[in-house]
């Protein structure tokens, strides 16, 4: 074939051969032919060959592409753009930005919007905000602000560099916003933890009176992720309805995300409904279900789902096994969890245990009060344990009041230079649980010396699509007087039922137990639960999400509320879901 091309006068045949080439060896043969016949000098042929080599070859060989590009004496703008784009897809994106700057200095080759777009993608890949700012200035001076595609890429840069303010400014300047522009803004808000703004945007986009843009599958995917993060079940149902009404329900990735969203909002019945209504399921679908069952405390059901998946001939992925081991941990299924972990180590699933898997097993052993065994497992790991694994063990030390081991764990975290405010809070909890107030005072002084500030607790509850957030002693809510009055009434009713504040949850060494009980009275989840009882009809399920691990006192408070007020209370804290019903919790008082 190559020999026949050398004698052919038709470039079309050659271009077709370049486009259809399938591997590096084939492209090297074509390269040799182009050099031998001098066809490499043909700008069109060179562009096609460079594009195929730099952009289409899997795996890409950026070094070979650079050598070919450097042999071109007078590369055109298209040739340069191809290389800048290739660098944006490589592991050396900064080289693409350097080429762009070199191009800018060449007055005979003025950059076009494509050059700026590919250079921005190089900055996105490398996280180079300063370089992006320089390109933004050039876009302005070159008069490219009306290029919607280029401006959308600029938004993506600011979003990636966690500069949502400038991303929003760019969005406002885009003359004609399409769905892609909106989706980049959605992604920006999610990445920058402006999750509630995503819901506002979705409503605005969905109700656009001009009808210029409507949410597509990607928009719905991002909105569902926001609902999952916030625990906004009602809004998630609205997005689900939109998906069904607009013919998007057949998309596998949307169905998988719906299963995950409902699970993370504590609605496993809806998650099951979506899962078993799917026309096809892949390993991501099963993983979403298993992980959802795990975080909601349905360990046996998660094991059943895993075995069912294997019967369908679907092999698990790393995340699937993380969900499975987590399910065993959250449900106290020690024997089952160790059995699956041993099967992993034997190579049955062709997946070697990673840090996440070890973390789940440490959690499993810690929950079962097998702290020494958990510590031994960590010390025997083939890879170096990370801070998350040590924090998992530290959490178990807090629950079981093992001060000595807790102090050892903190020393490991300090050695990793990974200690955080939450670690010290766990150790403070451990000290307070066993009444070592002098240790609490010492540790607080150390935290002050190290300028370690604790993260404030924040609890959220959704009402008719609106998310209401509370912090401890919150007085910002417009209905604060009603909320505090309701909370006082709840406390009175719970006291009659036998509720007593768990004063070990109060980390300050106050003078009396009464003072400690008062200090615990206005924790954020209590305010959220009181608001839920205030504004919803009797029998309505109350769903609360919290950014931190819920304390023992608030956990007891929720148990009593579920019994006295005959409500199902679902609290999602940093570690898991707590389903409170009839005075009991699905976590069996271990979290």
Swiss-Prot record:
Superkingdom as given in the UniProt entry: Eukaryota
Region (Type DYW motif): 496-591
Type E(+) motif: region residues: 465-495
Region called Type E motif, residue ranges: 389-464
GO MF annotations, alphabetized: RNA binding; zinc ion binding
UniProt keyword annotation of Zinc-finger present: no
Spans of repeat PPR: 76-110, 112-146, 147-177, 178-208, 216-250, 251-281, 282-316, 317-351, 354-384
Gene Ontology biological process terms, A to Z: RNA modification
Pfam families: DYW_deaminase (PF14432), E_motif (PF20431), PPR (PF01535), PPR_2 (PF13041)
Keyword Repeat: yes
Keyword terms: Repeat
NCBIfam families the record matches: PPR
Recorded family membership: Belongs to the PPR family. PCMP-H subfamily.
Protein name per Swiss-Prot or TrEMBL: Pentatricopeptide repeat-containing protein At3g47530
Biological source species: Arabidopsis thaliana
